[in-house]
Amino acid sequence: MEQAHTQLIAQLNERILAADNTPLYIKFAETVKNAVRSGVLEHGNILPGERDLSQLTGVSRITVRKAMQALEEEGVVTRSRGYGTQINNIFEYSLKEARGFSQQVVLRGKKPDTLWVNKRVVKCPEEVAQQLAVEAGSDVFLLKRIRYVDEEAVSIEESWVPAHLIHDVDAIGISLYDYFRSQHIYPQRTRSRVSARMPDAEFQSHIQLDSKIPVLVIKQVALDQQQRPIEYSISHCRSDLYVFVCEE
């Protein structure tokens, strides 16, 4: 822990001294987030107190407190009186990468798992048909599952896939994209839309989440190398555990 704190303080001081117009509390918060991404800080680590951070970095306690508030609002940390500020189990998910959930989890050094709720053929709803470029009422597979990261439930996902793309639905394990690749179908890129809403009763029946914490809703179309839609998914994700990244 001492080594992690030493590295964090060094990174904070370097960022604070950088000559740009970014507000100090944002520099502070960004540095903590980068330390989590790089593995310097891990889930469950306790940060130094506000007074120590202020003394070691030369910034005011007000600035430190503002940075901690920003981090708490983003779900990066949890603050509790008498216990301190703890790093949450954040999963950073790229909206640009066409790798799929399981592969992204593994690449970030975490353990993925899936609990299947449903795998069945249904008639394609109008909204889904538009996204998949198929006829409304045509056969599609509806795949519903609960996603886990390091044995913690983080999201509920529903996917619709044109029926002709799945020859053996029981062969799909924790990763739909692994199944696609086994059938020589290669997801190339994705189109995503992100919104927020409060958790409903169904979400809370599967995933424990404070009713005051919003759920992130990600609607995504996956396209193959010929730019043909191969999957349309709607994911409801815990906003306190997910960080979505979209970079050019």
Swiss-Prot record:
What residue ranges does this record give for the DNA-binding region?
Answer: 50-69
According to the UniProt entry, how is activity regulated?
Answer: Senses ADP-glucose (ADPG), which is the substrate for glycogen elongation, as an effector. In the presence of ADPG, GgaR becomes inactive and derepresses the yegTUV operon, leading to glycogen accumulation. In contrast, in the absence of glucose, the concentration of ADPG decreases, GgaR becomes active, and glycogen accumulation is repressed.
Q: What happens when the gene is disrupted?
A: In rich medium, deletion of the gene results in an inability to repress the yegTUV operon and promote glycogen accumulation, but no effect on growth is observed. In minimal glucose medium, the deletion mutant promotes glycogen accumulation, at the expense of poor cell proliferation. The mutant shows increased biofilm formation.
The protein's matches in CDD domains, at most eight in alphabetical order, are given as: WHTH_GntR
GO terms, biological process: negative regulation of DNA-templated transcription
Question: Pfam families annotated for this entry?
Answer: GntR, UTRA
Q: What induces it?
A: Protein expression level is constant in growth phase. Expression is affected by cold stress and glucose to lactose shift.
Its annotated function is as follows: Transcriptional regulator that regulates glycogen accumulation in response to the amount of glucose available to the cell. Acts as a repressor of the yegTUV operon, which may be involved in glycogen accumulation. Binds at two adjacent sites within the yegTUV upstream region.
Keyword field: DNA-binding, Repressor, Transcription, Transcription regulation
Recorded GO terms, molecular function?
DNA binding; DNA-binding transcription factor activity
Domain (HTH gntR-type): give its ranges.
22-90
Keyword Transcription recorded = yes
Query: Could you tell me what this protein is called?
Result: HTH-type transcriptional regulator GgaR
